[in-house]
């Protein structure tokens, strides 16, 4: 996010933090790294207006270590954040998975996000739900000609607007409109397939000079 001329990398908090009048929520569909979240809360001064669902799964050190084993890095092209292993524990319904309510440092920020958002909607106020990544890296997979995005070109979960509703705890009938955000130049983090990737040094130089250079957070 670029705000007031500054580049603000965010991985946990919603990009709506740039609006000082907004209340920020992280729904239970998000797996949370407490260290990164607390750092961003302090860095972007959102303490007092950000709340986290009590049942957000927690990324622990063991998840990050597992995510960085050679197979996951080279075959599945993971970014190594621990998101995948934490999501997998939730799907497998293991008893070892921790939730936000189990982390002492997160207790000041806990709430039932779905309940809060539905109350806000019933009062006629506006809610903007922010998803991550792009539709075509949903782990449901897509076919493009003879190529399939699954398994190397997908992320750990579905990334469509429908799943976003479930992630934040609201029903799809509450949604008035869905906004799709496009970038003029596509980018990708990781080593998976990337059709039409620009590798020509001269073209890349022009992109950088035009201010369109992008780096993963």
Features from the language model and the residues they span:
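Non-transmembrane, aqueous-exposed alpha-helical and coiled segments at domain scale
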Residues: 1-217
């Amino acid at each position: 996010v670029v705000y007031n001329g500054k580049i603000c990398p965010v991985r946990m908090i919603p990009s709506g933090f740039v609006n000082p009048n907004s209340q920020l929520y992280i729904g239970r569909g998000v797996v949370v790294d407490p260290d990164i979240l607390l750092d961003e809360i302090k860095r972007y001064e959102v303490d007092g207006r950000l709340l986290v669902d009590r049942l957000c799964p927690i990324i622990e050190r063991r998840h990050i270590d597992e995510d960085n084993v050679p197979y996951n890095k080279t075959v599945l092209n993971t970014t190594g954040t621990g998101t995948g292993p934490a999501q997998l524990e939730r799907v497998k319904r293991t008893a070892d998975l921790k939730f936000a309510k189990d982390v002492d440092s997160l207790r000041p920020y806990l709430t039932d996000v779905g309940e809060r958002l539905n109350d806000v909607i019933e009062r006629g106020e506006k809610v903007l739900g922010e998803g991550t990544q792009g539709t075509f890296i949903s782990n449901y997979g897509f076919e493009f000609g003879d190529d399939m995005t699954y398994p190397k070109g997908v992320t750990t979960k579905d990334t469509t607007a429908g799943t976003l509703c479930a992630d934040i705890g609201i029903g799809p009938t509450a949604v008035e409109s869905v906004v799709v955000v496009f970038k003029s130049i596509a980018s990708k983090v990781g080593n998976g397939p990337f059709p039409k990737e620009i590798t020509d040094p001269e073209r890349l130089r022009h992109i950088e000079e035009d201010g369109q250079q992008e780096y993963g957070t």
